[in-house]
Design a protein with these regions (language model features):
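Low-complexity segments
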Residues: 1-80
Length: 80
């Protein structure tokens, strides 16, 4: 997996970095276009299955089921 620079990530008010793991529920505020990341192929990540999206959370990418908000996979430290 590659690492890239990117625009500074701004957490919504009341949120700060936390290390997400598979099975946790991501708050609904992050299940929006503002946090979706479509450049996963350039990082060597696989396409999300139907109903899921790669979501940026600080330096990490989370694969999240959009119906449940459950984290399905995590790529740590993708963004510098």
């Amino acid at each position: 997996m590659g690492r890239i620079g990117g625009p500074a990530f701004r957490y919504p008010p009341g949120y700060a970095y936390q290390r997400w793991t598979v099975g946790l529920l991501l708050p609904a505020i992050f299940l929006s276009q503002a946090y979706y990341y479509d450049g996963y192929a350039a990082l060597g990540l696989y396409p999300p299955p139907p109903g899921s999206r790669w979501v940026r959370y600080g330096p990490d990418l989370l694969l999240v089921n959009l119906t449940t908000g459950r984290v399905e996979d995590v790529a740590y430290g993708v963004f510098l």
